[in-house]
């Protein structure tokens, strides 16, 4: 029986590979089902012989308790966006300045969810979401329910690969039809449906929704030399690889490819939102390196947003967590990029004045980045006698006078006791990217605030079960879950807390950069503006905003209250030593290193406080030159940049 189970497992996996990867079925559905049922029967009789890569592990479901955090061994970076031919030409010019003979691989930008898959000796070990690029969620059990992801590779490799999980338009339509029949809320678009599916706790639901994937990157070190070779290897290993791509050194040919794909975009079985252009040589990719946010060797061209006409019925003004008052237009409903849109942002008062937007106007509505509906401009030919829009002078929440600073485009409420400002701040603090207090969403925050239980973020950690039980709709079990989530948030790394404080200009990535240097929230109470401005990737605006916040007496009180409540103040990642030999310096590696490999050299430089980049510019402080160094070394000499060799680096 053990031998027969192994035979059936191998045979069915090969049939699945032919069907999903090669798109060339080698057996009829009825024959496949017959063999599959035989395997199920044998495994039920002899469960001790069930193999890890058995296709039966794709069927049925498990109720998961939740998703654990997963730190990526290889960070996932965002891509620089481009919206015009000129931006692509500028990218080409930057690359060709370093590598005149560079070629590019243009691939479709799938509108799905980024996933990372790690295999050991050919077996799938971890499937994870992108998260913030450094820490995602372990969704391995759900990943195993996606039929075109192999549980076992065709070779016993230890490898980490990247790709996109998506939902086809056909599956999306079927799911929404079923949800409509069941009286359930329909998904807005395939991407939202895929995102919701990957975070399902019931793996049987994941299996039914028929997600699919396209893989495009080997994140771990590879023996391949070119990106197109990587795609070929991924296909050979059993992954689904998108068949549409263009290899060329010509930006004209890439532009023609983009226009061809854009024209047939609606004919594809899945959603795409652009084309990604990558330097094809992996060695050149390594030389070009990364900025803080994105690789220098790739760029994502985003398709122009779909546009529709709609009438503005009214305008709502809402207060955000920093006091900014944002206008939102209520519209006659229109279908836009697969969703019904009835509200769109008007950005700010300067935008309203510039575009002369009035209630009753017919306007052009589009989705900014295919996500946020926005008003582009007014169709003046359809304007009648609409009056100029009245701009509020008082805060719609607290009634205090609004201010319009000369250097800002927005109205702002500066009353620190404004109810909306406080509520939005509390919501932000509890949000996933900040303290990630599961369940503490806007509705419950509003109830807590109106009941007088919370007035600032520190109050969250003083809440009791009795407080929650007094709220309408909160039962004992829900109260226990909320308290558990609040308690769990105390152990977050400090960059989550810093971001959660809602300081202007301090996003999640900036928070991490700051705490890599300072290590502790308490240290920011005495941090100097000029010191913060020296941190690579920041600058004077961020430094000023941070110091102004922590110079307030209320900030010291808040930090003390949070610390007393047991909230972690320490950064759990690797701290940068501000006294390190190369702290704050921008360094470029070039040429062949004889004693260290490039990753070892980069790790050492970063441990010494340096930022390692891929190109030489006026901002470069130091170049480490190995043998056969080329254009980067010559450019460094012409700019008068300090140059050292590998021996010098090894001795530090």
Curated annotation (Swiss-Prot):
Q: Which GO terms describe its biological process?
A: DNA repair; DNA replication
Q: State the active site.
A: 109
Specify the BRCT domain's residue ranges: 577-652
Q: Does the keyword Zinc-finger apply?
A: no
What reaction does this enzyme carry out catalytically? Answer: NAD(+) + (deoxyribonucleotide)n-3'-hydroxyl + 5'-phospho-(deoxyribonucleotide)m = (deoxyribonucleotide)n+m + AMP + beta-nicotinamide D-nucleotide
Write down the SMART domains for this protein, in alphabetical order: BRCT, HhH1, LIGANc
* InterPro entries, per database record: BRCT_dom (IPR001357), BRCT_dom_sf (IPR036420), DisA/LigA_HHH (IPR041663), DNA_ligase (IPR001679), DNA_ligase_AS (IPR018239), DNA_ligase_CS (IPR033136), DNAligase_adenylation (IPR013839), DNAligase_N (IPR013840)
Q: Mind telling me which PROSITE patterns this protein's record contains?
A: BRCT (PS50172), DNA_LIGASE_N1 (PS01055), DNA_LIGASE_N2 (PS01056)
Sites binding NAD(+) sit at: 29-33, 78-79, 107, 130, 164, 278, 302
Required co-factor(s) are:
Mg(2+); Mn(2+)
Q: Which domain of life is it from?
A: Bacteria
Keywords, A to Z, come to: DNA damage, DNA repair, DNA replication, Ligase, Magnesium, Manganese, Metal-binding, NAD, Zinc
Output the Gene Ontology terms for molecular function: DNA binding; DNA ligase (NAD+) activity; metal ion binding
Instruction: Please list the residues that bind Zn(2+).
Output: 395, 398, 413, 418
| SUPFAM superfamilies to which the protein is assigned, alphabetical | BRCT domain, DNA ligase/mRNA capping enzyme, catalytic domain, Nucleic acid-binding proteins, RuvA domain 2-like
Which Enzyme Commission number(s) are on file for it? 6.5.1.2
Which HAMAP family does the record cross-reference, listed alphabetically? DNA_ligase_A
The record describes the protein's role as:
DNA ligase that catalyzes the formation of phosphodiester linkages between 5'-phosphoryl and 3'-hydroxyl groups in double-stranded DNA using NAD as a coenzyme and as the energy source for the reaction. It is essential for DNA replication and repair of damaged DNA.
Q: Which family does it belong to?
A: Belongs to the NAD-dependent DNA ligase family. LigA subfamily.
This chain belongs to the protein called DNA ligase
Organism per entry:
Streptococcus pyogenes serotype M28 (strain MGAS6180)
